[in-house]
Amino acid sequence: NVEKKVKSKLIIIGEGPEMEKVNQFLENNPELISKIRLLGKVNDLYRILQLSDVFLLPSEQESFGLAALEAMAANTPVISSNAGGIPEVNIQGETGFLAEIGNVEAMSNYCIKLLSNEELLAQMKINAKQQAIKFDLKNVLPVYEEMYKTTIENFKGKLTKV
């Protein structure tokens, strides 16, 4: 759908049990082979993400969304499913878009929206990077340290030896 509206190419990175389904899909749809690249495991993921306009994360389950953060750190907006902890990372309409799990049509429409609007894409690239910076260890570590200190202070004198 996306390629019909906006010149684009789908790049699939990584390996795993789903690759068999992808290969079967391409076997059954040979006209799509020229529009999809299967890179498998890569050593230069950050560089590939930097060169990408959009990162798709159609997870059915996701605890935190580290892959989304990696894409955002490379200035790449994320179009993801609304699964697990992803909405805490990917902010709807700011760093990318969220779609209901399995809603491929919504994800396609978000791709078209981003890829056909250079101004929106440029702003989301900036927002994505800013969001990733919030999760950088040097920004997160002091928050955790303060939480631990507060917890320890609150329990001082309240603990008894058994």
Predicted segments, located by residue:
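A short hydrophobic beta-strand element within the catalytic core of glycosyltransferases
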Residues: 55-56
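Short glycine/serine-rich donor-binding loops of glycosyltransferases
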Residues: 65-68, 86
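Aromatic "clamp/platform" in nucleotide-sugar-dependent glycosyltransferases that forms part
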Residues: 41, 60
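Short hydrophobic beta-strand element within catalytic cores of glycosyltransferases
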Residues: 77-80, 90
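A conserved nucleotide-sugar
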Residues: 1-37, 120
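A short, well-ordered alpha-helix in the C-terminal region of glycosyltransferases
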Residues: 106, 113, 120-134, 143-146, ...
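C-terminal alpha-helical cap of glycosyltransferases
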Residues: 137-162
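Conserved acidic donor-binding segment of nucleotide-sugar-dependent glycosyltransferases
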Residues: 92-93, 97-104, 113-118
